[in-house]
Amino acid sequence: MDRKLSPHVGRGILAALCLTALIGAPATAQDGAPDRSQYTEMSSEELAQHLMFKAGGFKIDMATQEGTTVGKRLQQDALQKTCSGRSQMDSANVSKVIELARNSMEYPDGGIELGDWKKGQALSENAFGFRVGHNIDDHSAKETGGLCINCHKMEEKKAIRSGTLGPSLVNYGNNRGTGEDTKKYTYEVLYNPHVFFPCTKMPRFGVNGVLTQEKISHIMAYLLDPESPVNE
């Protein structure tokens, strides 16, 4: 999942709880901070900023797996700020999001190739990632994954434990082939899906370092390899 705050500021507090885990005790007012009676006077963005960064509900100085802090992880980047608080996007902002996503793209030095579909299958079902707080994911103890199956049906026989937030990916390779254009498209969707789906809820696996380029190649193989159970 995307390790930063959800694009929708109005839902920022809830997203922070879900994506980064609540750390510490419930929020309490600090010296000079508004009390709860003033919360209704704040905009959704002001309230989210106050509760996350000033009210003491999060240990914002706690170290994270990517080498920064919880506070840094909760800060929105330019793409997220562009998407935030808008139920509908005008063409200018859509173009801005696509441009930001396109500029973030990095490709393997040797070109885009398929990896090992069996490794991709394991990564697609692996929920180990970037949790912090009282239950920290220790990257030295276990490999991180992408948990694609949480949002997508990958194999027909695993439908009962597959998510439906995203489209079914059953027969992904059968329907698209393994040409260079297909491989490039699939890589880019995994690396930063906003380049094709502005303000999508799909995580930016590559640009945020959730999946390495090698791991992306394995998941691509799981989707595209004719021998993969995705394409049975």
Predicted regions and their residues:
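Disulfide-bonded cysteine motifs in exported proteins
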Residues: 78, 143-146
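Post-cleavage N-terminal segment of exported redox proteins
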Residues: 2-5, 14-16, 22-130, 222-232
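Sec-dependent bacterial lipoprotein signal peptides
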Residues: 10-12
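Short coil/linker segments at helix-helix boundaries
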Residues: 102, 130-144
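Extracytoplasmic electron-transfer domains, predominantly the class I c-type cytochrome c fold
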Residues: 33-43, 47-48, 115-119, 132, ...
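Generic anion/oxyanion-binding catalytic loop in active/binding sites
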Residues: 18, 108-109, 137, 205-208
